Each structure stands twice: as structure tokens, then as C-alpha cells.
Amino acid sequence: MSEIISVISREILDSRGNPTVEVEVTTADGNMGRAAVPSGASTGAHEACELRDGDKNRFLGKGVYKAVDNVREKIAPEIVGLQATEQVYIDKILRDIDGTENKSNLGANAILGVSLAVAKAAAKDCRLPLYRYVGGSQASRLPVPLMNVLNGGAHANNGLDIQEFMIVPTVNNSYAESLRAGTEIFHTLKKILAKKGLSTAVGDEGGFAPKLGSNQEALDLLMNAIVDAGYDPGQNVFLALDVAATEMFKEGKYEWQGGHISPTELLGIYKSWAEKYPLVSIEDGFAEDDWDSWVQSTAQMGSTMQLIGDDLFVTNPKRLRMGLEKKAGNALLVKVNQIGTLTETYEAVNLAQRNKFRTIMSHRSGETEDVTIADLAVGLNCHQIKTGSLCRGERTAKYNQLLRIEEDLGGMGLYWDKAAFR
């Protein structure tokens, strides 16, 4: 029986030492699904609401007791007795109880914890791994990792405008081999930084955060690390950026290396980098409400460059439909806590893939050891995954889960490889 008999919630710590919500759902079969909710540093204005307590005397106002209590007192009584396998129905109940567009009543952190824990309990009842429970027999492709090895922006206080400089390994049509390549490049980069007398301390997502003279210097460092590690830039390792441009947008211009530039000038920089470097993906290249620049950049670069909307779309089908109508962007970043339920996440991914958008499953800068997104990346047939650098346990946990899934799939498993960007 998949009848839900217990829903428990608690306050735990995320990777930044901030409180977050953890939920456990247990069924009559004795199976328990546990989910911990992540939290972002650079968040989109259109994201679902993360409910914090605001009590400055406790965790500096960042406690989540209100969300935890909402799970216990408002959600649990409504779903105990229901079948855990009725995911769509349960997610609808969660939204109905909340009653707001952005889930500000119960908190998206409360709702998501329950939604994911229900799915994990149901998967165990069905004796299936989560990726197979979510995706069925078609869940067989491993995503390409976008590895954030150099941090800037809101993730590091080091003078770099761009938030994430990433390497993208596509080696031997193998996830495991690509992960190995990324790891070797990461350690090679560390040696290069140390030799230059630069800091090898890491930021929130495990990438290095040295003080550099320019954004372009960061790109050059990545190119050197790729070559020194024995790989071929533009052949089996590529580059990707998360600009997080909303953080830089002020009064119609973008803060850039100590000054301000126009959207047209910023687009020109991206185009010049695309010619000089093996750059395959730019995330949030423009601010979340700078639709004109998104449309212009997609028209000029969209045929050859992946242009990911994160703050632009916030995993929300309504925002994504706006982008499709305007022809803004060509790829969707998928963050489950931006929308708040597994069902709505599926709807956003399905809408994107039907319209030939690439989909990229993503962590948040405030993560936990929960590996759910690795299973969801495979289960939802996402082309790529973002889960940080090659250190910090909350990041490597997801990479390791994908190794297990690749092993579990055996000969049926396929790696998206370069096809992830076509």
C-alpha cells in the first residue's frame, strides 16, 4: 500500500550554514522518502516564495520554523491517508492549501519538501529508483555536466562580474569519463592558480574564487587548465557562463569591470568571446525583465549559442510561454525550488522540450547532501546538469549519484555528449 501514514518536517542546515526544510513522508508499506530543500543566493524576482521566520534573534532572521510548522500543521493533515503515487493530485492539494500564485502562504520551501518526499516514498513503494519512477522506461540518458570551477558575482567577493565560469566535458560518449576529465581540469586549474600566487579558496559552489583583473582573464585560465590537463578545447571540452546579469542591471545599463555598459555593448562582448573561445552556453546573459535584449541576443546568437533563461523563466510555465512568444532564449534552467512542486517542474520541462528548448537541471548555491536533482535530470530527460564544482560534498554527491545511475543503466545508458547542445 502506498497510503501516506506519516509526514514529518524539521529544520536542518544547508551548505552555507543557513536553515532549510527537510521533510520525511512514510507509507503503510514502511517506506520513507526524505527530501531537503535548497536555497539560492542570486534569486529571480519571479521565483516562488521561500518562507523565512524573520526573527533576528534566531539564525539572524533566516530560520524556517514557520515553514516547518506549516508542513506539520497545515499540510500533513490534508495528505495523510492519500496514496503517495497520486503525485499530481497531491501537488494540486498543496497548491490549493496555499492559495497564492507564488506560494507565499505556506512557503515554497515547505511545499517542495513535501512534494519531493512524496515522490521518493512512492518510488520506494514501487521498488523503482527515483529516476525510473519519474521517467519510466525512457529515462536512459545521462546529462552533460556544466562544472562551475571559477566563481564570481554573488557567489564570491573577488571583483569578477560573471557569477560562474564553467567547463563542459564531452569525452568518449561517457558520463564517467567526462566527470574524470572535469576533475583533472579542476585540479590542474588549482595548480595554475597556486603557481601564480592566487587564492585557491573556494566559493559557495566549490569553484575557486581568486581575485583576477578581468572576466576575460578567467576564461584564459580555464583554457590553460584544459590544455595542461591534456584535453582539447573545442573538441572534447567547452566553456559555459552564468552571467547572472540581473545582479548587474542598474537603470538600463550593466555594471561591468568598474564601469557601466549598454545592453548592446554587452551583447558585443558575448559575440567576441564566442569567436575567441569554445563557448557553447550563456546563462542569464541579460536581466530577468530586459526582454528587448533577450530577444535581440536570441536573434543574433541563438542559432549557434545556447542561451539559458534562469531568472528569466524561473522554471515557471507562464514565464516560459512569454519567452516562447517573444522568441527570447532557447534553453530552460530547471530549479525545483523556483516553482515549488514536482508536477509544475515536469510541466515546465515538458513545455520547453516540446518547443525544442534544451533543459538544464540545476542545484542552488545553498545545497544539501540530497541527491534528488541527479535522478530528476535523468528522469526528466534533461540535456545537462549544473551541480557545482568538483569539491564540497553537497556538490560531488550529485555527481556520484549520476555515476550510480549510469552503472544501473548499464548498456542501455547513453550520454548526451555534444548532442546536448544541438
Curated annotation (Swiss-Prot):
One of its GO terms (molecular function) is phosphopyruvate hydratase activity. The active site is at residues 205, 335. InterPro entries: Enolase, Enolase-like_C_sf, Enolase-like_N, Enolase_C, Enolase_CS, Enolase_N. Binds a second Mg(2+) ion via substrate during catalysis. It is found in: Cytoplasm; Secreted; Cell surface. GO terms for cellular component: cell surface; extracellular region; phosphopyruvate hydratase complex. Keywords: Cytoplasm, Glycolysis, Lyase, Magnesium, Metal-binding, Secreted. Its cofactor is Mg(2+). Pathway: Carbohydrate degradation; glycolysis; pyruvate from D-glyceraldehyde 3-phosphate: step 4/5. GO terms for biological process: glycolytic process. (2R)-2-phosphoglycerate binds at residues 163, 335, 364-365, 386. It comes from the Bacteria. Its EC number is 4.2.1.11. It catalyses: (2R)-2-phosphoglycerate = phosphoenolpyruvate + H2O. It is an enzyme of class 4 (lyase). The keyword Transport does not apply. Belongs to the enolase family. Catalyzes the reversible conversion of 2-phosphoglycerate (2-PG) into phosphoenolpyruvate (PEP). It is essential for the degradation of carbohydrates via glycolysis. This is Enolase. It comes from Bdellovibrio bacteriovorus (strain ATCC 15356 / DSM 50701 / NCIMB 9529 / HD100).
